[in-house]
Structures are given as structure tokens and as C-alpha cells.
A protein has these predicted regions:
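The feature captures the conserved acid-bearing segment of alpha/beta-hydrolase catalytic domains
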Residues: 169-184, 195-232
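Catalytic nucleophile-loop/oxyanion-hole region of alpha/beta-hydrolase
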Residues: 83-92, 103-141, 262-263
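Short beta-to-alpha linker loops that shape the active-site pocket of alpha/beta-hydrolase fold enzymes
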Residues: 78, 101, 106-110, 176, ...
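C-terminal catalytic histidine-bearing segment of alpha/beta-hydrolase fold enzymes
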Residues: 217, 227, 231, 238-281
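Primarily recognizes the serine-hydrolase "nucleophile elbow" in alpha/beta-hydrolase
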Residues: 124-189, 198-199
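N-terminal cap/lid segment of alpha/beta-hydrolase-fold proteins
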Residues: 17-66
């Protein structure tokens, strides 16, 4: 169902996850920060590698053994205006336990930059990441992995020329894909999208690359309008002929969804881990 039907029926509660989840959002985000500090020492490799002059143009690299099959490039969420790669360290630790190599990206945020500038900076970041991987002999296939706004970012960056013939999959967790809806929300005070830019970055009118497999996941306890974003995106991919799976995670909301999907010991996480590993075969 189109997001437009919600214009007179609670856009904020449908399309602002912090409003939808209520007090649990702050609890979850505080837990992410606390657990990420506690588990940072589980992550080997290098932190805060620069790909540009802005202080948020940084990424972490956590290599797996070179015979391991997949490298994940992660993009954090936060509605393009908040959070940090460091908030994802405990999720990265869970993925590392699964045997994946990891690149955890930061990027300049709105309103310090526009969405278009953000995507340009991240394109530079992908250039630098691929150069670093190749220089280190890390030639494994790549999966891009993103939550919320990070899912939107991953779909658009699928067109990056340095990822051609190497990007095998995208795991998009509880994403927002029709960016025009942001024009109706309070978060646009920070994101500052205009009509033309919102259209430019709509994932349905500017579809992601043909070739990678897609895993589109969303929490079963999320608002119906938000769930529809993932369903509509998965349906568009399937209609185009892409390999796309839709996974509704029963009982999970926008934030604990990430905890469960990164953890191979959770049944939803085991399914995602298996899907990612299958792409190396």
C-alpha cells in the first residue's frame, strides 16, 4: 500500500521508528552503545581508516581469514542524520563470529551535508575500501548490509563501478525506500530533502543494480506502513526478475530486529547468515 494513504492518518507513527517504538527506542540505542563498547575488543583489525577529510569519512576493517568466503560492508541507520558506526560494534562482533570479514562505514550526516553529498562521499569511501581490500589480497565477494537509512544507502551504492562483478548480495534490514515520504515528516528538518532530491534517491524509481541477490527483512511488529516499504521493494525486485527474498521477522521492532538478525544463534539470524554464506558457493 502506498505511503500516501497515511498522510491523514499518522505519518509520524508509521514512518518514524523512534515514534513507533516509543520509549523502547532509547533503551535499545543505549544498549547498543553500551554493548558496543564492551565488545569492541572482540574485533580485530583497524579502526577509523580515513577515506576523506570530513571527520566522519572513516571506516573500520575487521578481516576474516583469507579463505573465508564473504566480506560484508555495513552502513548504519539513523535516518541519514544520526548514529555512528561505533554503535554497531556489537553487531559487527556477532557477524565476525559467523566468519565474515567486515567493513563498517561511517559517513557525514544531514544536515551537515545533503543526501546527494552523502552519497558522493560514500562513493569515495567504496573506492577506498576496494583499493584497500585488493592491496591486502582480500578478493572475496562482497555483500552490502544496511539497516534503516543504511539499507537505502546500500541499494543505491549497488551501482558503484568498483563493485561490478564482485557484489553478490545486499541485506537490507527494515529500510526506507520511497524518500518522498520524508518530505512529510519532522525528521526533514534535519535531512532537508527537497522534492527533486527526494525523487532522485527513491529506490523504486531508481532501482538498485541488476545482478546481486537481495534479502529484504523487516520486523513483524513494525507499523504496517513501514512494513509495506520492504514488501513493495521486494516485490519490485521480484517483478524485475531479481533473486530476492522477503523475510518478516515475527515479534520484532525496528531496533531489536538488528540484534536478532546479526546473531546466528537466533532463528532469524541463522536464516540470514545461511543466506549470506550461500552466495559464496
Amino acid at each position: 500500500m502506498s505511503w500516501r494513504v497515511w498522510r491523514d492518518h499518522g505519518m509520524e507513527s508509521q514512518f518514524n521508528p523512534r515514534v513507533a517504538v516509543g520509549n523502547a527506542a532509547a533503551v535499545c540505542l543505549a544498549a547498543w552503545a553500551e554493548q558496543s563498547v564492551a565488545r569492541k575488543n572482540e574485533l580485530t583489525g583497524r579502526f577509523d581508516l580515513a577515506y576523506g577529510p570530513h571527520h566522519l569519512m572513516r571506516y573500520d576493517f575487521h578481516p576474516a581469514q583469507k579463505d573465508r568466503p564473504i566480506i560484508i560492508i555495513n552502513f548504519h541507520g539513523g535516518y541519514w542524520r544520526a548514529l555512528d558506526k561505533a554503535d554497531m560494534n556489537h553487531h559487527m562482533a556477532d557477524l565476525a563470529k559467523g566468519g565474515f570479514g567486515l567493513v563498517n562505514m561511517n559517513y557525514p550526516l544531514c544536515p551537515d551535508v545533503s543526501m546527494t553529498q552523502m552519497m558522493t562521499h560514500l562513493g569515495t569511501g567504496i573506492d577506498d575500501v576496494v583499493k584497500m581490500l585488493d592491496a591486502g589480497g582480500h578478493h572475496q565477494p562482497i555483500i552490502m548490509f544496511g539497516h534503516s537509512a543504511g539499507a537505502h544507502i546500500a541499494l543505491h551504492l549497488s551501482h558503484h563501478p568498483k563493485l561490478a562483478n564482485r557484489l553478490v548480495g545486499i541485506a537490507a534490514l527494515s529500510g526506507i525506500y520511497e524518500t518522498e515520504l520524508v518530505l512529510e515528516l519532522a525528521v526533514n528538518e534535519d535531512v532537508r530533502l527537497g522534492k527533486d532530491e527526494a525523487y532522485k534517491w527513491n529506490c523504486l524509481t531508481h532501482m538498485p543494480a541488476v545482478g546481486p541477490a537481495y534479502y529484504i527483512a523487516v520486523g513483524g511488529s513494525e507499523p504496517s506502513g513501514w512494513i509495506d516499504q520492504s514488501w513493495i521493494m521486494a516485490e519490485a525486485l521480484c517483478q524485475r526478475g531479481d533473486s530476492a527474498q522477503f523475510h518478516g521477522c515475527g515479534g520484532l521492532h525496528h531496533f531489536n530486529l538488528v540484534d536478532c538478525l546479526c546473531d546466528a544463534n537466533h532463528h532469524d539470524g541463522a536464516r540470514l547468515h545461511d543466506w549470506m554464506k550461500s552466495l559464496s558457493r
